[in-house]
Regions:
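Electropositive polyanion-binding surfaces
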Residues: 2-42, 46-52, 62-482, 491-499, ...
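Residue-level recognition of conserved beta-strand edge/terminus positions
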Residues: 487-489
Length: 505
């Protein structure tokens, strides 16, 4: 097999390499999406992907004008909560801040206060802002720049829970006992002010050095309790590290790209547990009331679970037949190449998620969290959160759900279905393009890989390549679970396709 480069054997990725040897990268602003992997690749151009899938990244001028002039529709209904020292925790540089948190210790356990951006306060029913959000459904996060659900005047300013700014919010207060189980819930509209804008990396360092911000000093403890709670132990909760693409100079004065795994701080998972907790409380609330909007996911089939266990063993993990997959995943370090690979494989167990209206008590659970669940914590980037939240507020106050909610609920569900499919397609296309771009420089080279699955009858296999950390197709069917040397046959940017061959040249 011909190659313009000297043949090089690429071995295991060394995650312990010192940071000073890693190359800088321009980050794009992203927010936590616990069901998806984050890809930081601002050094690449994803506009062709956006055009192919019809993703609109901008807004017409009149939409910007409407967003800039919008005011709080519920100003007279708010409880003054400005005395509460909320803080936000997000990726570095983020300005679309949906959530702020404060955790207190009480006699019976803990009280979790969670302030959520009140987007409904700024979106007038029947307005152009409502129409565009009903069309888009959710923010689509391309790695170079996002296609936002709302204009920046809202998502990064008036509705965002920015540090030091008085903001309208929907505030949840959830009491937990000493085991982390829910004992009481309160939700209302309020005015809040974030005291600090924290990022995950610095918060993790602070936690490890005993100087975590007082407002979240209990977050690690509460997060761990929630992970260990009865419903959560057997749930399939993914902890996928992000990946970033860096530009690396060649010896011949050219350059190529590499993928680096971004270590996932524990504080990120603990923070995600607060969002999951709130969504589970909201789901239970709506099911008991007999109305609302749920996030649903049917349990994985026995066949898909068996396939996952086989792939885990092929990657070198030990998983006993009786061990719940959720419990196994909690034991895996996602910041290693194999750990990231098995977390990505576990995504297949969460296929088929959707949204449903609660009707006549006939409600589906979300097997990914282990109970009823609703999306209510990310209204800046997801349409349905705005509407599900109104159900919860109505239930809590004993009032009717607003007509502007019930009038368009079916459209909201349809838009979420369509936009979720679109977001998944764009995610996959961006990842495929990234992997093809990174590997293009190494066409014809040999790589070390482990065989995740093998189909001799089709003369094909699925591989996990150690460096760069990619899952890819292979011509040839080496034995599952074995380490093999394979040759990169194709890295096609136009087709966004990567293909290896075995045996290696």
């Amino acid at each position: 097999m011909s190659s313009t480069h000297t043949k090089t054997y690429l071995g295991n990725l060394d995650p312990s390499a010192p940071k000073e040897t890693q190359h800088p990268c321009i980050y794009f602003s992203a927010v936590e999406q616990w069901e998806r992997m984050k890809l930081y690749a601002a050094v690449l151009d994803f506009e062709p992907v956006a055009q192919e899938f019809g993703v609109e990244r901008g807004f017409d001028p009149h939409i910007h004008d409407e967003a800039a002039s919008s005011v709080d529709r519920y100003a007279q209904e708010r409880e003054d909560l400005l005395h509460m020292p909320f803080v936000t925790i997000d990726p570095v540089g983020s300005r679309d801040l949906d959530q702020a948190v404060l955790i207190e210790e009480i006699d019976s356990g803990f009280r979790v206060h969670y302030a959520i951006a009140d987007v409904a306060a700024f979106v007038e029913p029947g307005s152009e802002l409502e129409k565009i959000s009903l069309h888009r459904g959710q923010t689509i996060y391309l790695p170079d720049s996002p296609a936002r659900l709302h204009p920046e005047e809202l998502s990064e300013d008036a509705a965002s829970l920015l540090e030091g700014q008085t903001r309208p919010a929907v505030v949840w207060s959830i009491d937990l006992d000493e085991r982390g189980e829910v004992t009481a819930t309160k939700v209302r509209r309020g005015l809040v002010k974030s005291r600090a804008r924290l990022d995950y990396d610095q918060a993790q360092i602070d936690a490890e050095n005993g100087r975590l911000h007082p407002s979240i000093s209990l977050l690690p403890k509460v997060g761990q309790l929630r992970q260990e709670s009865a419903l959560r132990r057997e749930a399939v909760n993914l902890s996928i590290p992000s990946q970033r693409v860096v530009k690396v100079p060649n010896d011949d004065a050219g350059e190529h790209y590499e993928i680096v795994i971004e270590p996932r701080p524990h504080i990120m998972d603990y923070n995600s547990e607060i969002s999951l907790l709130t969504g589970m409380v909201a789901g239970e609330m709506m099911v008991k009331a007999g109305h609302g909007l749920l996030r649903t996911l049917a349990p994985a089939t026995k066949e898909s679970e068996a396939t996952f266990r086989s792939e885990a063993q092929a990657l070198g993990f030990e998983i006993a037949p009786e061990q719940p997959i959720g419990e196994f995943l909690q034991s895996v370090d996602p910041n290693t190449p194999k750990g990231m690979a098995i977390q990505r494989e576990a995504q297949k167990l969460l296929r088929g998620s959707g949204y449903a209206s609660v009707k006549n008590g006939d409600s589906e659970v979300h097997s990914g969290v282990g109970g009823y669940y609703a999306h209510v914590t990310a209204p800046l980037r997801r349409l349905i959160d705005r509407f599900a939240t109104e159900h919860c507020l109505a239930i809590a106050s004993g009032t009717d759900v607003p007509e502007w909610v019930t009038r368009v609920e079916e459209q909201v569900l349809d838009t979420m279905k369509y936009s979720s499919i679109l977001a998944s397609q764009v995610d996959n296309a961006c990842l495929d393009l990234t992997e093809a771009t990174v590997l293009k420089y190494w066409e014809g080279q040999n790589f070390n890989a482990v065989v995740v699955a093998s189909e001799p009858e089709k003369n094909s296999a699925r591989l996990f390549v150690y460096k760069p950390p990619v899952l890819a197709k292979c011509i040839g069917a080496p034995e599952q679970g074995t380490n093999q040397e394979v040759t990169l046959v194709t890295a096609n940017l136009k087709k966004r396709e990567v293909l290896f061959a075995w045996p290696a040249d």
